[in-house]
């Protein structure tokens, strides 16, 4: 079984798949859990990329789930075969969460993955102003060390190419203790200088100018997204600055088809965006911010409790930094449950 000739990206197939998915949307059943999660995520859209090693899902099933099969060269086998990656259309709200629930079941039943695979999360409807971009970049640099303790060591030090590197300190906005006391001119200068450094990093060596800027959204590196080195960090700002769909991509997660892990990761990353949006004064003035602080601030202690428990469980699981990824891990992924919500 196969899909014939596939492309390496999903953009061209999104309109068709979205149209078919929407024609089935009245049949999507929403549970109380789906509704609760969607309320926490608010107005953000979300799309996921599930890398696999083996498996096949027929088009009638894919279309109902808003899934698009693509090729991923990073997964190429020694035989030359390129396994499939399954990419969702942009999803939103309780029906989007319900769809992820259904996708989780189908992927678990029909696909397998290994250590070379990942799950990537795109979140859309995010702010695009310079203040947010600077705040988000600095926040992710602040939490990345703690975030990596929730994943096995191979995500930090893979054998081959690292597709989810840590953000470099060179491009991070400086901590500024008197942020609240800056006048408008000082604030504009701080944000502008910070943004220009981030733009230089994301554009792979260009400061904003007439040819390359936020309005024309042209990336200096042409000839395929895989040539853009700034994509391959634990958070990817390239689509936010240079693509029409304006999303942030979170690339760190290990491969999974487990709905508990998917939902928790979506809530954790959404919380990062909310915190960077509403509390830039805290981001710019503090050198240390914990994930627990962020979750409590964004969701409130009662709603955050289960997500914090999940984070602690992940840290405990990988405290010995076990690197193997065999049948034990695949079975754990299939059967893992935690009443987070």
Task: Spell out what each predicted region is.
Residues 2-114, 126-341:
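C-terminal accessory/tail domains of diverse enzymes
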């Amino acid at each position: 079984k196969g899909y014939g000739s596939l492309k390496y990206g999903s953009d061209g197939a999104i309109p068709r798949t979205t149209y078919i998915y929407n024609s089935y949307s009245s049949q999507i059943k929403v549970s109380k859990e789906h509704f609760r999660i969607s309320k926490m995520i608010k107005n953000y859209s979300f799309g996921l990329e599930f890398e696999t090693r083996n498996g096949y899902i027929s088009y009638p099933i894919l279309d109902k789930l808003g899934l698009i099969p693509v090729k991923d060269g990073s997964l190429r086998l020694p035989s030359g075969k390129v396994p499939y990656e399954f990419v969702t259309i942009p999803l939103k709200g309780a029906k989007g969460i319900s769809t992820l629930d259904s996708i989780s079941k189908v992927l678990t039943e029909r696909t397998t993955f290994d250590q070379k695979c990942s799950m990537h999360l795109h979140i859309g409807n995010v702010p695009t102003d310079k203040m947010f971009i600077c705040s988000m970049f600095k926040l992710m640099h602040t939490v990345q060390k703690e975030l990596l303790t929730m994943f096995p060591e191979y995500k930090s030090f893979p054998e081959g190419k690292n597709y989810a590197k840590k953000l470099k300190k060179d491009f991070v906005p400086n901590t500024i203790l008197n942020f609240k006391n800056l006048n408008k001119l000082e604030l504009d200068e701080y944000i502008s200088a910070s943004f220009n450094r981030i733009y230089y990093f994301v554009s792979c060596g260009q400061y904003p100018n007439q040819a390359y800027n936020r309005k024309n959204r042209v990336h200096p590196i042409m000839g395929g997204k895989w040539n853009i080195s700034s994509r391959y960090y634990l958070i990817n700002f390239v689509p936010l600055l240079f693509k029409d769909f304006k999303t942030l991509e979170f690339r760190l997660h290990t491969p999974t088809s487990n709905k508990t892990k998917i939902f928790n990761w979506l809530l954790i990353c959404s919380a990062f965006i909310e915190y960077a949006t509403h509390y830039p004064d805290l981001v710019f003035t503090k050198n240390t911010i914990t994930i627990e602080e962020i979750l409590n601030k964004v969701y409130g202690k009662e709603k955050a409790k289960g997500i914090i428990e999940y984070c602690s469980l992940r840290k405990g699981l990988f405290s010995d930094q076990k690197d193997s990824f065999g049948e034990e891990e695949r079975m754990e992924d299939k059967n893992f449950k935690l009443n987070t919500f």
